[in-house]
């Protein structure tokens, strides 16, 4: 196996991992949305329900964004930036959506301080994806 073959193999594995992470997060976002719509109705007040649905919506948006970054990584010149974007999107899902899920379900307001960091991670992910797009051209 040449160095080129090894690099191509590692690159393909990273892309497959990001696609797997995107698919798992997409499924989790659908499950969360369904749980919120059917399992939590009547158990949460209107504000908590809105917070939960916001978490599920942004979870799905950024699960799709991870998949987009994985596809952008197919262009060798953009792979580093696309991997950075996918990482930021995943961190954003954990911090933003995760904190909102917990906040809506537990009512612990102290969790709210984490949410903006997740939003910043989402923004950084989109900037990194734009950077990847300039490299792919």
Question: What do the PLM-derived regions correspond to, one by one?
Answer:
Residues 3-137:
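Polytopic transmembrane helical bundles with strong interfacial aromatic enrichment
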